[in-house]
């Protein structure tokens, strides 16, 4: 059984390795795939129990974009977007204004009469997004929407999705295997392994305090800092790996110990980033006080009390 609590007007990610079941889960949310057991509820409706007209109506409230765009190559950009509105039964007189409005939103107003073959990969994905949100959906499903794009284009697509989430109030469920995607735009994340959700919660909390071994492994790839063996073996003093979370990353902790205890502080490796405007980082530091070893011990204790975690690498 897979259970994920959906929060309205949220940006939720599903993260896992290939074969974990991420895309299959996403496809159950609009009944493209039926669950072998259990129920799928979207917007309070058990979509897994619907069929025929009721299912078609429910799907009109759920947009979807794909990894490889799935555009109709013989139709223009405007015609691709208009197709979804015609399928939803829009009045002919209202389709053209809505198409123009949505193409302006996604930055393609000047590409309305172009064909997909004339577009870049990022522009094709913008058409896919425009088509998916044209009918005012409540939920937008995104199946690895940036995996076929370069880093710069991916960033612009993610920024557009965040804009749509904030401006239109659409709940976005995004499937990805890229940790940077989750950190940059998502509010919540569900981590999948072996067809099961092994952990879920606020994105910052999952990076700062991963509970499941699989999540810890994923997070370690982005935060792990390794020193060359030469430094680990030959540098004097104590080597510490310090985890900073939230406010502790904004405090002059290392300056304090240098002044208060008279120890020399040498930063050997480090990384601090911001997830949802909250700081998360790791520093590897060397503490030395050749003529006062007790000062180093006191400095380590001071750091422990003011940061999230301290690991003594050596010393």
UniProtKB/Swiss-Prot annotation:
ATP binds at residues 16-23. It comes from the Bacteria. Its main location: membrane. Residues 2-219 form the ABC transporter domain. It is found in: Cell inner membrane. It is an enzyme of class 7 (translocase). InterPro entries: AAA+_ATPase, ABC_transporter-like_ATP-bd, ABC_transporter-like_CS, ACT-like_dom_sf, MetN_ABC_transporter-like, NIL_domain, P-loop_NTPase. Disulfide bonds: none annotated. The complex is composed of two ATP-binding proteins (MetN), two transmembrane proteins (MetI) and a solute-binding protein (MetQ). This is Methionine import ATP-binding protein MetN. It comes from Salmonella enteritidis. The lineage of its organism: Bacteria, Pseudomonadati, Pseudomonadota, Gammaproteobacteria, Enterobacterales.
């Amino acid at each position: 059984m897979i259970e994920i609590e959906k929060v309205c007007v949220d940006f939720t990610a599903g993260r896992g390795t290939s074969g974990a079941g991420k895309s299959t889960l996403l496809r159950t949310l609009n009944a493209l795939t039926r669950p072998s057991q259990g129920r799928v509820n979207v917007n309070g409706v058990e979509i897994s129990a619907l069929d025929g007209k009721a299912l078609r109506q429910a799907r009109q409230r759920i947009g979807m974009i794909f990894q490889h765009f799935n555009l109709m190559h013989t139709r223009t950009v405007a015609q691709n977007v208009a197709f979804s509105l015609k399928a939803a039964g829009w009045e002919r007189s209202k389709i053209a204004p809505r198409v123009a409005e949505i193409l302006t939103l996604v930055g393609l107003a000047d590409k309305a009469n172009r064909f997909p073959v004339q577009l870049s990969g990022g522009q094709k994905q913008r058409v896919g997004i425009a088509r998916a949100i044209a009918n005012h959906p409540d939920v937008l499903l995104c199946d690895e929407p940036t995996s076929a794009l370069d880093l710069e284009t991916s960033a612009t697509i993610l920024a557009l999705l965040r804009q749509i989430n904030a401006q239109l109030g659409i709940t976005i469920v995004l499937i990805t295997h890229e940790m940077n995607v989750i950190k940059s735009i998502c509010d919540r994340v569900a981590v999948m392994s072996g067809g099961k959700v092994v952990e879920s919660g606020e994105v910052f909390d999952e990076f700062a305090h991963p509970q499941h071994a699989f999540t810890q492994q994923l997070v370690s790839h982005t935060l792990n800092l390794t020193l060359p063996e030469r430094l680990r073996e030959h540098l004097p003093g104590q080597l510490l790996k310090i985890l900073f979370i939230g406010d502790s990353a904004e405090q002059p902790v290392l300056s304090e110990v240098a002044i208060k205890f008279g120890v020399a502080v040498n930063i050997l490796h480090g990384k601090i980033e911001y997830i949802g405007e909250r700081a998360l980082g790791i520093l590897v530091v060397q503490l030395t006080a050749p003529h006062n070893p007790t000062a180093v011990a006191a400095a380590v204790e001071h750091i422990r009390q003011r940061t999230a975690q301290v690991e003594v690498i050596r010393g």
